[in-house]
């Protein structure tokens, strides 16, 4: 999916509002995913998945950092996310559907925290962005 110039502007503006909260929002999205889609917990058998756990917060920071990296490389997402794609495809073997589930939870989290900025156009742009990130992360599965 190709991001238009307007999409890129919307994504950068929205992520700019996220600011230093990317890790917190990532952790919140993970918690939402674990609650709403309990089968996703199977990829984290060694984690304490309780609310506010240090392990979920640490992984949320990784998610937030990866998305921040992606926002900074909207014109070369495959290059920017190549190592993460390798990790998830070859080492972790995460089922690709889980990226869609986490994307849904990220959108919900952003809508809660950025209600005035989460317009239909921004929602659509963020959805396209997260879908593109998911596609890149699953590209090495083939």
Curated annotation (Swiss-Prot):
Database matches in CDD domains: Hb-alpha-like
Species this chain originates from: Equus quagga burchellii (Burchell's zebra)
GO biological process assignments: hydrogen peroxide catabolic process
Keywords: Heme, Iron, Metal-binding, Oxygen transport, Transport
Domain Globin per the UniProt entry, residue ranges: 2-142
Tissue and organ distribution: Red blood cells.
General function of this protein: Involved in oxygen transport from the lung to the various peripheral tissues.
One cellular component (GO) term of this entry: hemoglobin complex
Family note: Belongs to the globin family.
Gene name linked to the record: HBA2
GO molecular function: haptoglobin binding; heme binding; iron ion binding; organic acid binding; oxygen binding; oxygen carrier activity; peroxidase activity
Subunit structure as annotated in this protein's UniProt entry: Heterotetramer of two alpha chains and two beta chains.
Keyword Hydrolase part of the UniProt annotation: no
Name the UniProt record assigns to this protein: Hemoglobin subunit alpha-2
Binding annotation for heme b: 88
Pfam families listed in its UniProt record: Globin (PF00042)
Residues involved in O2 binding: 59
Top-level lineage group: Eukaryota
């Amino acid at each position: 999916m190709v991001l238009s110039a307007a999409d890129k502007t919307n994504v950068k503006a929205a992520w700019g509002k996220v600011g230093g909260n990317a890790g917190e929002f990532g952790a919140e999205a993970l918690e939402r995913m674990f609650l709403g889609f309990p089968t996703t917990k199977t990829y984290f058998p060694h984690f304490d998945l309780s609310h506010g756990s240090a392990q979920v917060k640490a992984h949320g920071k990784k998610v937030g950092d990866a998305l921040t990296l992606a926002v900074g490389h909207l014109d070369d997402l495959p290059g920017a996310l190549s190592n993460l794609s390798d990790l998830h495809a070859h080492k972790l073997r995460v089922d690709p559907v889980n990226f869609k589930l986490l994307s849904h939870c990220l959108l919900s989290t952003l809508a809660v925290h950025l209600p005035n900025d989460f317009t239909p156009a921004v929602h659509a742009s963020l959805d396209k962005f997260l879908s593109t990130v998911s596609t890149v992360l699953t590209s090495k599965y083939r």
